């Protein structure tokens, strides 16, 4: 069985908007595996998720999704593959001139044949699960950061995917978010997805509330695995 995600000797030079580059990064995740990655609090913006989702080609090494090197995929194949990934972005990741509701449901509506009402009902349930009263209809610029983070979590778990890239999903949202977030991660793992959870919180890194296959620590551009 091919790993869901495999990074092999990945190197990315440092450049803005990131706080650091990557050097010799290698790890793989099988279906149903979770990796938590501890980031330095002073350098939380890393290109790791962009590389893992095929948005940033590494200068050296390979990034493979379900056995296919992102660098060898054509635009259509990469788009189809990326539809099987979900993400909570370190930055906002919103289309500015679209309501949060449209942002939240756009990918699922575009990449599946599900009825819009079905998608909207699931989105509403997820928003409530993550502590919002309903699917927000505000512009992203009109919402508070904690509520946007909750909406990002709802968007990430709308529908199903093979790979979840969660960049500090708990950031600015308070401890009440964690039970719902951990439950959704456990559900994704149970369906055979792989999850990468990046965090600056040592407590979350050690115990994200879900079985953890790998604990990784990013120090500058270097990624090291912590042994039990």
Protein language model regions, located:
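Conserved ABC ATPase "signature" region
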Residues: 118-135
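Helix-to-loop junction immediately C-terminal to a conserved catalytic motif
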Residues: 53
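ABC ATPase C-loop
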Residues: 156-157
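Conserved ABC transporter NBD signature motif
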Residues: 61-71
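ABC ATPase NBD coupling module
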Residues: 69-86
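Q-loop/switch helix immediately C-terminal to the Walker
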Residues: 91, 97-110, 122
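ABC-type ATPase nucleotide-binding domains, specifically the catalytic core motifs of the NBD
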Residues: 15, 105-118, 129
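Conserved ABC ATPase signature
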Residues: 139-147
């Amino acid at each position: 069985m091919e790993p869901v995600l495999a990074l092999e000797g990945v190197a990315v030079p440092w450049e803005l908007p990131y706080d650091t580059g990557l050097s010799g990064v290698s790890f793989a995740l099988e279906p149903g595996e979770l990796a938590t990655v501890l980031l330095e609090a002073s350098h939380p913006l890393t290109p790791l998720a962009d590389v893992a989702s095929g948005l940033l080609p590494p200068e050296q090494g390979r990034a493979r999704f379900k056995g296919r090197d992102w660098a060898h995929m054509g635009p259509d194949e990469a788009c189809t593959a990326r539809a099987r990934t979900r993400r909570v972005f370190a930055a906002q990741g919103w289309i500015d001139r679209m309501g949060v509701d449209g942002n939240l449901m756009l990918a699922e509506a575009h990449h599946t044949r599900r009825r819009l009402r079905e998608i909207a009902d699931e989105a509403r349930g997820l928003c409530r699960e993550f502590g919002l009263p309903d699917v927000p209809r505000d512009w992203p610029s009109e919402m508070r950061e904690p509520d946007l983070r909750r909406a990002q979590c709802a968007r990430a778990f709308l529908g199903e995917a093979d790979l979840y890239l969660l960049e500090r999903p708990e950031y600015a949202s308070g401890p009440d978010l964690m039970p719902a977030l951990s439950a959704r991660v456990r559900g994704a793992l149970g369906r055979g997805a792989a999850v990468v959870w990046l965090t600056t919180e040592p407590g979350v890194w050690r115990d994200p509330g879900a079985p953890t296959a790998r604990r990784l620590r990013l120090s500058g551009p270097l990624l090291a695995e912590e042994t039990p």
